[in-house]
């Protein structure tokens, strides 16, 4: 099988469970305001995220998702074609205010992805 995924849109995945825990922590303080929050672990493209999803799935005992059975092909947004949702090329966020106000950074997105795949019993 073959899957094409855009490689020129950059951001950081965010696990909703981790974000919800952060919101609970925020509610319990008086540090009101606007914050940017995403999982740690660096910026990646949608293509890189797809590759990691399938890598972790294969490592969890699903060989149908390994590189021998599934090819993930990087393409540009232009090559991919029209999408129903307009997406920014760069959706990186500055999260420095979180730590300045004493909040713990969210775990790495790779760890979050692994926890998510286990949660859904993938």
Which residue ranges define each predicted feature?
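Substrate-positioning beta->alpha
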Residues: 4-28, 33
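Hydrophobic "lid"/C-terminal helical patch
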Residues: 23-27, 53, 113-117
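Mid/C-terminal beta-alpha module of Rossmann-like enzyme folds, strongest
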Residues: 29-83
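Residue-level signal for the nucleotide or nucleotide-sugar donor/cofactor binding architecture
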Residues: 11-14, 44, 93, 104-107
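Amphipathic terminal alpha-helices
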Residues: 99, 108-122
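Conserved short-loop catalytic and cofactor-binding motifs
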Residues: 6-10, 37-41, 86, 100
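A hydrophobic C-terminal alpha-helical subdomain
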Residues: 78-99
């Amino acid at each position: 099988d073959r899957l094409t995924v855009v490689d020129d849109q950059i951001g950081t995945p965010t696990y909703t469970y981790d974000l919800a825990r952060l919101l609970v922590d925020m509610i319990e303080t008086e540090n009101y305001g606007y914050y940017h929050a995403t999982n740690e672990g660096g910026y990646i493209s949608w293509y890189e995220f797809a590759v990691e999803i399938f890598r972790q799935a294969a490592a969890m005992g699903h060989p149908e998702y390994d590189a021998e059975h599934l090819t993930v092909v990087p393409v540009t947004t232009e090559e991919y074609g029209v999408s129903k949702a307009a997406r920014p090329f760069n959706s990186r966020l500055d999260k420095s205010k979180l730590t300045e106000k004493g909040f713990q950074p969210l775990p790495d997105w790779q760890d979050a992805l692994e926890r998510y795949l286990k949660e859904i019993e993938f």
